[in-house]
């Protein structure tokens, strides 16, 4: 359905078509020339989302996507004739024949898709831009470049933590954000928000929602200061992944620290433990290569042992 492909209008590109000559049955040359056209011609004229199969038309040839046909109760808004019973096969073929690149092609993505389907991929593209969480920094880049950028340009606020062990995460309430780096990989944004009930604390990984990228879990603990015995714990089986930090109050996935837990302290002295859900694709490929090399070494050792045995005989 077209509603699944897009939620907003996009900047369109012009698609070129080749120019060639063919001959008809009588041997005469018939010129067939292609022209440039705007991709928004392949959008539903009603909702302006990308057309995807099934596409319907009325008897007068007006087209609409399936979701619009349902919303309009199968009545064409242009001529009031019934629409939604007959599919526009030729329009479906045109839409499927137009191939477009991923919007992140300039950042390294080489994927191509039928028109409209690239938006579905864009949400999970590992080349989607991520934004630097440092205040007053406008840098954006692919997630791996962002990590090196933060280390080089914001080293004074750089904090590295390891895997599977609790480490200190001391967040100054006035600064609202603490950035941690998980090993040599993802940046973790720990944020606090002052609300009526207390302090909201969130933990997010700055990474695209691509398979094998920034897939982490975490545990967060806060102990009542000044000798208190109370400890708060917050655990998430899967850390949220974001491309850009937001300073709007979260509606879910936060730890609430009541003000009476804070005392007069201006710093949230927490501890955090981060674990990886599964290996990144690149690390998995490296492991496979190392396993293959080990297998080759084992085979060579077996061959050497067989040769030694033959010599002894």
From Swiss-Prot:
EC number: 2.3.2.27
Entry keywords, A to Z: Metal-binding, Transferase, Ubl conjugation pathway, Zinc, Zinc-finger
CDD domains listed in its UniProt record: RING-HC_SIAHs (cd16571)
Region (Disordered): 1-26, 278-313
Region feature (SBD): 94-277
GO molecular function: transferase activity; zinc ion binding
Binding positions for Zn(2+) 2 per the UniProt entry: 132, 137, 149, 154
Domain notes for this protein: The RING-type zinc finger domain is essential for ubiquitin ligase activity.
PANTHER family reported in the protein's UniProt record: E3 UBIQUITIN-PROTEIN LIGASE SINA-LIKE 1-RELATED, E3 UBIQUITIN-PROTEIN LIGASE SINA-LIKE 4
Protein name: E3 ubiquitin-protein ligase SINA-like 2
């Amino acid at each position: 359905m077209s509603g699944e492909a897009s939620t907003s209008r996009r900047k369109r590109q012009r698609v070129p078509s080749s120019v060639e000559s063919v001959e008809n049955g009588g041997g005469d040359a018939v010129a067939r020339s292609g022209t440039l056209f705007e991709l928004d011609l392949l959008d539903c004229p009603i909702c302006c989302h990308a057309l995807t199969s099934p596409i319907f038309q009325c008897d007068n040839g007006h087209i609409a996507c399936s979701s619009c046909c349902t919303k309009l109760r199968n009545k064409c808004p242009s001529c009031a004739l019934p629409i939604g019973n007959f599919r526009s096969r030729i329009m479906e073929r045109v839409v499927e024949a137009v191939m477009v690149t991923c919007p992140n092609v300039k950042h390294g993505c080489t994927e191509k898709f039928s028109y409209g389907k690239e938006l579905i991929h864009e949400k999970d593209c590992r080349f989607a831009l991520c934004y630097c969480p440092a205040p007053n920094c406008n840098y954006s880049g692919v997630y791996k470049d962002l990590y090196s950028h933060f280390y080089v340009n914001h080293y004074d606020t750089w904090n590295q933590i390891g895997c599977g062990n609790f480490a200190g995460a001391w967040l100054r309430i006035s600064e609202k954000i603490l950035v941690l780096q998980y090993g040599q990989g993802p940046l973790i944004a720990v944020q606090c928000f002052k609300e009526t009930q207390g302090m909201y604390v969130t933990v997010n990984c700055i990474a695209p929602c691509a398979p094998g990228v920034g897939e982490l879990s975490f545990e967060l603990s806060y102990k009542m200061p000044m000798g208190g015995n109370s400890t708060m714990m917050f655990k998430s089986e899967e850390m949220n992944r974001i491309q850009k930090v937001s300073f709007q109050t979260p509606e879910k996935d936060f730890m609430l620290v009541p003000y009476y837990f804070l005392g007069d302290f201006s710093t949230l002295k927490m501890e955090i433990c981060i674990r990886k859900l599964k290996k990144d694709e690149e690390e998995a490929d490296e492991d496979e290569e190392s396993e293959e090399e080990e297998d080759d070494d084992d085979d060579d050792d077996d061959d050497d042992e067989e040769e030694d045995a033959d010599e002894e005989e």
